[in-house]
């Protein structure tokens, strides 16, 4: 039925194919191309970052035999410790005393080695002393110095005075009476000077800042002054003369 253009209720129909976009033709394509380029650039940057970052280094792992050796060492130390503790518990009083003395001896030997190093008495000097065969006066002086260091190293021992007594007698008995008389005069002179030094030391003992009085020998006995630093001789030298 034909519709009249003059009808009051006439409404014209708009074409349905009209696009709602306000953009010009081809404008949407430009936007899509631009977005595509930006995406590609971002992907390239991500790839470069991924390539630049070094892969994390794996932690070094112990080899199987190293782990086994370490475990065996720990178990062995633990077993030795348990045996030592158990042995100490099972020891008799006599065994404990013997072990204590053994440990004490080891400590004394360690202290002795330390003291020898402190006083300059080394194994090299001891070996030199054993192989020393003096022939000249200078060599005998060096020989006396080595002997003095070796002997006076034990001066703090209670047995030291008796040892010196026996040593001097065993040496003098092989000498002539003239030599013994000359040595006796030297010892007498040393005895007198030693008494004076000890007497002066007693009078100055209360004074602070002053050292112990030292004897000083002159004349033929002046060479004995160098041995004063090695220790004090006993006052009983005149008993065996």
UniProtKB/Swiss-Prot annotation:
Molecular function terms, GO-annotated: translation initiation factor activity
Pfam families: eIF3_subunit
Ranges of compositional bias, category Acidic residues: 26-45
Coiled-coil stretches noted in the UniProt entry, renumbered to this chain: 61-118
Keywords: Coiled coil, Cytoplasm, Initiation factor, Protein biosynthesis
Ranges of biased composition (kind: Basic and acidic residues): 66-89
Chief location category: cytoplasm
Alphabetical list of InterPro entries matching this protein: eIF3-like_dom_sf, eIF3j
Start and end residues of each stretch annotated as Disordered: 1-94
GO cellular component terms listed in the entry, alphabetical order: eukaryotic 43S preinitiation complex; eukaryotic 48S preinitiation complex; eukaryotic translation initiation factor 3 complex
Subcellular location per the Swiss-Prot or TrEMBL entry: Cytoplasm
UniProt-listed Gene3D superfamilies: Eukaryotic translation initiation factor 3 like domains
GO BP annotations listed: formation of cytoplasmic translation initiation complex
Membrane-spanning ranges: none
Subunit architecture: Component of the eukaryotic translation initiation factor 3 (eIF-3) complex.
Role noted for this protein: Component of the eukaryotic translation initiation factor 3 (eIF-3) complex, which is involved in protein synthesis of a specialized repertoire of mRNAs and, together with other initiation factors, stimulates binding of mRNA and methionyl-tRNAi to the 40S ribosome. The eIF-3 complex specifically targets and initiates translation of a subset of mRNAs involved in cell proliferation.
Family note: Belongs to the eIF-3 subunit J family.
Annotated protein name in UniProt: Eukaryotic translation initiation factor 3 subunit J
Organism: Bombyx mori
């Amino acid at each position: 039925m034909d519709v009249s253009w003059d009808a009051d209720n006439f409404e014209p129909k708009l074409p349905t194919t009209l696009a709602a976009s306000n953009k010009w033709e081809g404008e949407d394509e430009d936007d899509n191309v631009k977005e595509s380029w930006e995406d590609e650039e971002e992907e390239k940057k991500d790839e470069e970052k991924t390539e630049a970052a070094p892969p994390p280094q794996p932690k070094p792992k112990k080899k199987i035999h190293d782990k086994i050796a370490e475990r065996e060492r720990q178990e062995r130390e633990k077993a030795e410790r348990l045996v030592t503790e158990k042995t100490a518990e099972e020891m008799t009083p006599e065994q404990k005393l013997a072990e204590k003395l053994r440990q004490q001896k080891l400590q004394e030997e360690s202290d002795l080695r330390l003291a020898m190093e402190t006083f300059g008495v080394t194994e090299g000097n001891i070996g030199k002393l054993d192989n020393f065969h003096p022939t000249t006066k200078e060599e005998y002086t060096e020989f006396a110095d080595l002997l003095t260091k070796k002997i006076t190293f034990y001066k703090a021992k209670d047995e030291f005075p008796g040892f010196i007594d026996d040593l001097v007698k065993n040496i003098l008995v092989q000498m002539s009476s003239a030599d013994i008389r000359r040595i006796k005069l030297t010892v007498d002179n040393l005895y007198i000077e030693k008494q004076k030094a000890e007497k002066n030391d007693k009078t100055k003992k209360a004074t602070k800042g002053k050292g112990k009085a030292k004897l000083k020998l002159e004349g033929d006995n002046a060479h004995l002054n160098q041995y004063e630093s090695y220790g004090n001789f006993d006052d009983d030298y005149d008993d065996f003369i």
